[in-house]
């Protein structure tokens, strides 16, 4: 046996690790063994602290039963485990439970002593004997208490009523932001861009081609403290407009006689207009937006006028300096169109108050400029071809009628030439200036010359380029007899058309002197026509009549007119010559029998020659009695008329 070699035997230790998983290839995955701390924690988790602890005698039995039940279950499964005779953690559990109970009791006692909500540690004091009180004093105290209680109830009720009234008033004054935004949408175009609400002030939807965006922003008004009393004009909504549209603006149109120096062309005489007052019930944002939109429209008008002033070629070029356009419609006359924009800052208000000069501003032309720019917007919209039926021929109606109703070259050229905004306003300014000059000329003649009287009746139905006035020349007291001079003045852009009663038409230029000379000549002719009408009424005979006398001194203004009338029996004759400058000259011719200073000769022997009238004698017209020329002529004719 000694010579037999030793045989190596492989001894494999028993697997102390539990198998977690066996793979398909036969490999086993083991669980790591628990450490001492993990094993202690696993055992502590098996302790039931909620189970009440009994007597010491019962505890081993109960613990034995608790440990016996799992051991029996393990025996049934075929597993053999170590089972101690007594539970090792039983004393630990009991001590922990008793310590927890004592700590809870200590915490309750400390909290009660500290807070004194349920128990106070005060010594017991004997109650003092009740003092003896007077019954009347007790009755007074009870009445005071009852009155105080009633007063307190009344005060609480009054305070509650006042609070309810104040809350109702605040609820009426305080408007909701959404309802105010709905009102804003009813008047202005709004859109949502991100978290902002933007609106549109421009006239692009009406046909405007102005490049300004005209956008405003709707914001919430947070400048007021809701805890305090809300003012009457409080609005939860506010609008924020661009800085260049703040304040107020207007287009100033003025006509001046003398052109200023070239260095003063850029200065504009501003006068501060009062801000438009909001109507009762109108929110403040409505007035603010309307003012900003007016500023935008004024800027568009001035930009259009400036562009046309540079493009139009005229004999006298238009001048554009800063915010002012200078034009000369007539020689020695200047038309100024200015954009006046005053912001809300104090400097602009101070400068505007220092330069107040509203006298030269023509509000009519400013209003016409707004109308003209709106007409341009309307034409821009109308130029777009609107939807039409598919069966109808495509194109404009004028083009469809070009075959049967064709236009000639002049009509087509007239349709293609469109006047600009500046040309139209210059023509209107010319007409307004010519109309004012005509009215001033007529008024000056009426105030300067009392006999004959001149009356002007202006027509209410006028055009922007034409007006009419009816001029009557009469004598006081003889309006029914003297109706021969009736003139119709049609005032145009650059000339005045005068229509006489008999249909004759005379064209006058824009010069004031021409109109004045014409009216003076007509007033001179009126006196002669009045003598003619008076002679017919008095029974006198008209021997000669002429509106333009070729004899005598030459008048620098028009021509003199003359008339000769004879008495009913032919004994007397009156000759009247009236000129615009020389005035009236009246001469009377008497019979030869009444002329004592005639030389006697032997040539005329027959008495029939004595019936001829003698030479004319001039009447000292200044010494005649009467309020006017026609009345003096009536007295003279009455004196020379035989009974």
Curated annotation (Swiss-Prot):
Keywords: Activator, Nucleus, Transcription, Transcription regulation. Signal peptide: none annotated. One of its GO terms (molecular function) is transcription coactivator activity. Residues 50-75 are annotated as: Disordered. The keyword Transcription applies. GO terms for cellular component: core mediator complex; mediator complex; nucleus; transcription regulator complex. It holds the Pfam family Med17. Its main location: nucleus. GO terms for biological process: DNA-templated transcription; positive regulation of DNA-templated transcription; positive regulation of transcription by RNA polymerase II; positive regulation of transcription initiation by RNA polymerase II; regulation of transcription by RNA polymerase II. InterPro entries: Mediator_Med17. Component of the Mediator complex. Component of the Mediator complex, a coactivator involved in the regulated transcription of nearly all RNA polymerase II-dependent genes. Mediator functions as a bridge to convey information from gene-specific regulatory proteins to the basal RNA polymerase II transcription machinery. Mediator is recruited to promoters by direct interactions with regulatory proteins and serves as a scaffold for the assembly of a functional preinitiation complex with RNA polymerase II and the general transcription factors. Belongs to the Mediator complex subunit 17 family. This is Mediator of RNA polymerase II transcription subunit 17. It comes from Gallus gallus (Chicken).
């Amino acid at each position: 046996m000694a010579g037999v070699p030793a045989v190596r035997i492989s001894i494999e230790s028993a697997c102390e690790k539990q198998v977690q998983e066996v793979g398909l290839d036969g490999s086993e995955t083991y669980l790591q063994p628990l450490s001492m701390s993990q094993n202690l924690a696993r055992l502590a988790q098996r302790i039931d602290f909620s189970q009440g602890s009994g007597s010491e005698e019962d505890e081993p039995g109960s613990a034995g039963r608790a440990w016996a039940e799992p051991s029996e279950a393990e025996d049934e499964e075929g597993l053999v485990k170590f089972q101690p005779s007594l539970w090792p953690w039983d004393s630990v559990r009991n001590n922990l439970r008793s310590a927890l109970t004592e700590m809870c009791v200590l915490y309750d006692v400390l909290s009660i002593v500290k807070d004194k909500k349920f128990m106070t540690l005060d010594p017991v004091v004997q109650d003092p004997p009740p003092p003896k009180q007077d019954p009347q004093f007790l009755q007074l105290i009870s009445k005071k208490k009852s009155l105080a209680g009633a007063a307190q109830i009344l005060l609480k009720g009054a305070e509650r009523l006042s609070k309810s009234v104040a809350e109702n008033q605040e609820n009426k004054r305080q408007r909701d932001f959404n309802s105010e935004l709905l009102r804003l949408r009813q008047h202005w175009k709004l859109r949502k861009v991100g978290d902002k609400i933007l609106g549109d002030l421009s006239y692009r939807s009406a046909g405007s081609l102005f490049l300004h965006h005209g956008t405003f922003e709707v914001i919430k008004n947070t400048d007021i403290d809701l805890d305090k009393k809300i003012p009457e004009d409080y609005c939860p909504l506010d609008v924020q407009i661009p800085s260049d549209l703040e304040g107020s603006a207007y287009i100033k149109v003025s006509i001046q006689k003398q052109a200023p120096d070239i260095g003063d062309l850029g200065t504009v005489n501003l006068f501060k207009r009062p801000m438009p007052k909001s109507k009762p019930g109108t929110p403040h944002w409505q007035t603010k937006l309307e003012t900003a939109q007016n500023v935008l429209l004024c800027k568009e008008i001035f930009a259009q006028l400036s562009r046309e002033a540079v493009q139009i070629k005229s004999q006298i070029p238009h001048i554009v300096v800063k915010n002012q356009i200078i034009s000369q419609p007539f020689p020695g006359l200047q038309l100024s169109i200015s954009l006046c924009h005053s912001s809300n800052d104090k400097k602009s208000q101070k400068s505007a108050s220092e330069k107040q000069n509203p006298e030269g501003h023509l509000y009519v032309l400013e209003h016409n400029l707004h109308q003209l720019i709106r007409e341009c917007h309307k034409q821009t919209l109308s130029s777009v071809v609107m939807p039409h039926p598919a069966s109808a021929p495509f194109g404009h109606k004028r083009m469809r009628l070009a075959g049967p109703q064709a236009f000639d070259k002049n009509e087509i050229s007239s349709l293609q030439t469109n006047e600009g905004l500046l040309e139209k306003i210059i023509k209107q300014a010319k007409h307004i200036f010519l109309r004012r000059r005509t009215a001033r000329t007529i008024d000056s003649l009426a105030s300067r010359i009392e006999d004959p009287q001149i009356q002007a009746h202006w027509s209410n139905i006028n055009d922007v380029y034409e007006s009419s006035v009816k001029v009557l020349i009469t004598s006081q007291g003889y309006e029914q007899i003297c109706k021969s001079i009736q003139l119709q003045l049609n005032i145009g852009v650059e000339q005045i058309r005068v229509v006489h009663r008999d249909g004759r038409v005379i064209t006058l230029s824009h010069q004031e002197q021409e109109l004045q000379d014409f009216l003076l000549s007509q007033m001179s002719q009126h006196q002669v026509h009045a003598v003619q009408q008076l002679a017919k009424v008095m029974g006198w005979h008209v021997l000669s009549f002429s509106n333009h006398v070729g004899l005598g001194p030459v008048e620098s203004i028009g021509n003199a007119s003359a008339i000769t009338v004879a008495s009913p029996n032919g004994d007397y004759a009156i000759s009247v010559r009236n000129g615009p400058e020389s005035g009236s000259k009246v001469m009377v011719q008497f019979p030869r029998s009444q002329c004592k200073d005639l030389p006697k000769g032997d040539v005329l022997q027959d008495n029939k020659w004595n019936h001829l009238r003698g030479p004319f004698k001039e009447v000292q017209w200044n010494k005649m009695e009467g309020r006017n020329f026609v009345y003096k002529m009536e007295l003279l004719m009455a004196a020379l008329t035989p009974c």
